[in-house]
Amino acid sequence: MRLTSQIVVYLLFLFVACMVCHGEVARLKPDARLLTSFYLLLSAGGAAGGIFVAIIAPSIFQTFWEYQLGIWAIALLLVLILFRDPTSWLHGAKPGLLAPTATLTLLLLVPKYLVHARILTIPTPLSLAYNFVLGLLIPVCIWFAFTGGPTWTRQRKFRWLEITAVGSFVLLTVALCLQIKANNIYTYRQRNFYGAVAVNSNWDADMIHVAYEFMHGRTIHGIQLSDNRKEPAAYYGERSGARIALLTKPQRQVGAMRVGAIGLGIGTIAAYGRAGDVYRFYEINPAVIDLAQGKKGYFSYLQDSAARIEVVPGDARLSLEAEAARGEFQKFDVLFADAFSGDSIPVHLLTKEAMALYLSHLHGPDSVIVVNVTNRAIDISSVVAGLAQEYGLKATLIDAPNRSGIYLRSDFVLLTRGKLLDIPEIQKAGHFMRKDRHIAQNRIWTDDYSNVATLLRFR
């Protein structure tokens, strides 16, 4: 129910925010002679907001602080509206208004502390409600703390209300400090137009460094061990579909291989490269490329690989289309599509047209496309199964369990026209995918149609 709770809370907040903002815009609308200036300023405000979110925020924030600030700003606006409205309950300052503030604040601090202490690695749905209530309480507490509140608190000497207000203000300040400190637990952090990336250091009980984790948003995209830096970890361990696809490929036994990868991460699959092999990565995010190439000093899979490494910056599909237009078909023996495990799904890489492009870049019928469908919120495997059926491909799903936090749970779908899936090791590890009710209920994604909502895991 975690995903369901998050969706309900987020949509509820969005509804409240839209009602407050649009309601105030409608209330403040001037008479006809000033409408031109009114709509001009309204348009300028929308443009300014877009510029702030798209350009300024990624430049000045290392994480998505504009979202938190937006929640607080909406709550502050709501308080100011209630203060100014003579008919509101806040304008009248009814007795007992702030009595439960301290208790409420402490209750709201609990989920924040659990996330900060990494007892909870994923924020609960309460986090959004926390930020909203925080924005509501801060101006009220400041007002009580520095003005003494309404006259009835001074006339009746309800000093406990002022004490509660000051105490709550202090607690809220601590909460803000915890929020800021929670974003400083990472060894390295950077944000650009494509999102926020971070590197986290893992230590054991004896404070010996164990591994570096690469995170994009809230999702781990790669792990490299400190004591065995050439060991593939995270989603590419010994029982993963990626490893099985690479090591059981007959071409590996007779000569060099050409391996392509849509999505670089930290380049973990390069650890399987041998002398003479070519591993070609397509990556759109320059920050990810810098980390994978070792420019920050955390990851070295690309540097340590015996294979020849090629990194193509830019959108993978556009790059592959440009190569095809030039007649430069890559003839991959194995093509990895590993761009679907994060917080957002690049839909254009999972369409019917995209699959046709991938197939055109394969070496032959025995080549294989390996799709990483590991995702805690979205069932991507049904889309891949539908594409396999559309193009007459054999498909098998290989899942590997989480082991010790270093080798993460992974789900890979192997697609081929040849006999690779008949190899006993793959048959033992995989589950052949056939048309089922999930595929039947979903249309094949195309460049003109996609529907992520139908793939959400509501559990």
Question: Each predicted region: which residue ranges?
Answer:
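ABC-family ATPase nucleotide-binding domain "signature/switch" substructure
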Residues: 292, 438, 442
